[in-house]
Structure formats: structure tokens, C-alpha cells
A protein has these predicted regions:
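A catalytic-pocket lid/entrance helix-loop region that shapes and gates access to the active site
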Residues: 202-204, 209-318
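Glycine-rich His-Gly loop
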Residues: 75-77, 104-107, 219
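Glycine-rich nucleophile elbow surrounding the catalytic serine of serine-hydrolase chemistry
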Residues: 192-202
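Catalytic-loop region of hydrolases
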Residues: 11-98, 110-114, 268-271, 281-325
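Classical eukaryotic N-terminal signal peptides for Sec-dependent ER targeting/secretion
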Residues: 1-10
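Cap/lid segment of the alpha/beta-hydrolase catalytic domain
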Residues: 96, 106-182, 228
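Short, solvent-exposed loop/turn and secondary-structure capping segments
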Residues: 82-86, 111-116, 131, 137-146, ...
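Alpha/beta-hydrolase fold nucleophile elbow
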Residues: 183-194
Length: 325
């Protein structure tokens, strides 16, 4: 019995190793005779066995539930710009026959490998790009006053960032999927949040033919106005000034507005259906002559400087000549 068990175990190990060899070879060679768009260049292909790739996301470690073929590539665009992207192709058995492209966050410049892995683990062939520029060359993807961000001075890279970055890598990603599985994906989807949400809106407007469905969460949309609002808010509630609004003050203000206007639509559900109909007065949160703004480290009212800052933020910037918002 022991001999039979050992023989069976060795046979299983041999079969597993043989299967890994086949999948390694499939991943390594399937792009060799593949014709992609002339501006697309394959950098490398790597096969990963199940549970061998670890992506750290906050306090969580995410492993690949399935074996997959990773294809890393670039797309050249504009006069001298490059977009990097990766495609994760799960083994045939867990593959659900569908394609999911994922977007970027913030200033982008990196691939969202957490989202890539999550979609892979859900059975999708997934792809992501860096939006056409590198965070490492752009203040590590962080914006700050008086900081030079090279890609923001390159009109082609700014255009790619929101409008075109996803569309640049999706056609080649679909070609890779078709070549690997010998058939096209049955459906193609996009998912993104914040900057990725704005990219989703741009896809629907400028590249609607690429996807069967688009998930655009919390879209950081209308960037000309959004960027101005960041500067405006920082100007009126700057840190280390009397007008500064810490998160506790923002939470206090937001909760007061919610309590005043939540039920206007007939349902008290934690959502203000129409903020423009909410006629809440920030002055109602002002500290009176006997109050201090904090009580046992809890915000209970706003100081005159904070009231002025909150009013400016709610009112927003206006055209200095016309007075229009």
C-alpha cells in the first residue's frame, strides 16, 4: 500500500510538472508569430503557477488564485511618449471568457496591479496600463504646489492620461487574448474609480466601441474645474492657519448637512438626492461667545475663520470679471 501511495504521489507530481512545462511553453511562445499594432512592443511573457504572486494592498496580501500568463508590453504614441501595460491571462479552466480592463488612480504613472489581480481571481483576462507616463519621472505620482510635473507640460501625455490611455492598450490586449485562447473574448468590460472613473466617462464619450460595459466609480471628472477646486480649497483652508479644516471638522460639517437635508427626497437613507436643493446655512455651526470648537477632542462648532473657509469652499471659485462660478 505504501509503495502504491508513493508511486501515485510521484505520478501526480510528474503530471503537475509536465502541465507547468506545457503552460510555461504556451506562455513563452504564443506571441512569437503574433502581429500586433506596429506601435506595440512585447517586452516579456512569464507564466505564474497558482499562489506564487503576492500583491500587497494596504494590510492585505492578495495571491493569484489561478495560474496565469503575464504579458508585459509597451505602446508608443505621440512624438516620443510610451505607455506600459500588462495583460493577465488565466488558465483555460478558470477563465470566464471575458475581458476586463482596469483604470488608474490619481496622477497615474503606475499599473493598478491590485485591481489586475482581483479581476484575474474572478476569472477575467485582465489588463492595465500606466496612463502613458511614469510616476517615477513625475514626483512619484504626487501633485503639489510649486512642484514641476513633466507630463503635465506635455499635451499628448495629458490627453492620454484621461482621454486615451485605456484605448491605447485595449486593442492589443484583445489580440493577445484571442491568440492565447484561440477565440475572442465574449464580452469586454472596463472598471475604474476616481481618475479611473473619469477615464470611464472618456471611454464612453470618445471610444464607445471598445467595451460592452463600463463601471465608472467616483469619477474625478471635468479636470479643468476639479484641479482649480483643489487649489481654491487649499488657499482658503490651508494647513497651519486658523482657517484650517481638519478631517474631524469636515466630518462634523458633512454630518450636519446630511441631517438637515437627507429627508428632503422623502427617504432618510444617508444620501442627499439633490444637493442644489439643500439650503443649509453654515452659520448655524458657528461657535457662540461661550463655546470653544472642541469638547473632549470632539468638534462641536466652527470658529469664525473656519466658517469663512467653509463658505468659500461651498461657494467655489468665481470668475473675477463676471462673478460666475
Amino acid at each position: 500500500m505504501k509503495t502504491s501511495a508513493i508511486t501515485a504521489t510521484l505520478g501526480a507530481v510528474h503530471a503537475t510538472n509536465a502541465l507547468l512545462t506545457i503552460r510555461n511553453n504556451d506562455c513563452a511562445f504564443f506571441t512569437h508569430n503574433l502581429t500586433l499594432a506596429e506601435n506595440t512592443k512585447i517586452l516579456n511573457t512569464t507564466y505564474h503557477a497558482p499562489h506564487t504572486v503576492n500583491i500587497t494592498s494596504g494590510q492585505q496580501n492578495i495571491y493569484n488564485s489561478h495560474g496565469f500568463c503575464e504579458v508585459d508590453a509597451t505602446v508608443s504614441y505621440g512624438r516620443n511618449s510610451t505607455l506600459h501595460f500588462s495583460v493577465y491571462l488565466p488558465d483555460a479552466l478558470p477563465y470566464n471568457g471575458r475581458f476586463m480592463a482596469v483604470g488608474n488612480g490619481g496622477m497615474a504613472g503606475v499599473l493598478d496591479k491590485t485591481a489586475l489581480m482581483q479581476q484575474l481571481n474572478s476569472g477575467f483576462a485582465s489588463a492595465a496600463g500606466d496612463a502613458g507616463h511614469l510616476a517615477s519621472l513625475n514626483n512619484d505620482g504626487s501633485g503639489a504646489p510649486d512642484t514641476y510635473i513633466p507630463y503635465l507640460h506635455n499635451p499628448e501625455e495629458v490627453q492620454a492620461w484621461i482621454h486615451d490611455a485605456i484605448a491605447l492598450f485595449v486593442p492589443s490586449s484583445k489580440d493577445l487574448i484571442e491568440a492565447y485562447y484561440n477565440k475572442t473574448a465574449a464580452y469586454s468590460y472596463y472598471s475604474g474609480c476616481s481618475t479611473g472613473g473619469a477615464q470611464g466617462f472618456a471611454l464612453a464619450q470618445h471610444h464607445p466601441e471598445l467595451f460592452d460595459g463600463i463601471i465608472a466609480g467616483c469619477p474625478g471628472n471635468w479636470y479643468s474645474h476639479l484641479a482649480l477646486s483643489f487649489l481654491w480649497n487649499a488657499r482658503h483652508a490651508a494647513e497651519n492657519t486658523l482657517a484650517y479644516l481638519p478631517q474631524t471638522a469636515l466630518n462634523f460639517t458633512g454630518q450636519a448637512v446630511l441631517e438637515a437635508c437627507d429627508a428632503q427626497d422623502g427617504v432618510k437613507d444617508g444620501v442627499i438626492e439633490n444637493p442644489l436643493e439643500c439650503n443649509f446655512s453654515i452659520d448655524s455651526l458657528a461657535c457662540n461667545a461661550t463655546q470653544i470648537s472642541r469638547n473632549n477632542n470632539t468638534i462641536i462648532c466652527l470658529t469664525p475663520d473656519q466658517i469663512a473657509a467653509a463658505k468659500a469652499i461651498y461657494d467655489g471659485p468665481r470668475d473675477s470679471e463676471t462673478g460666475e462660478q
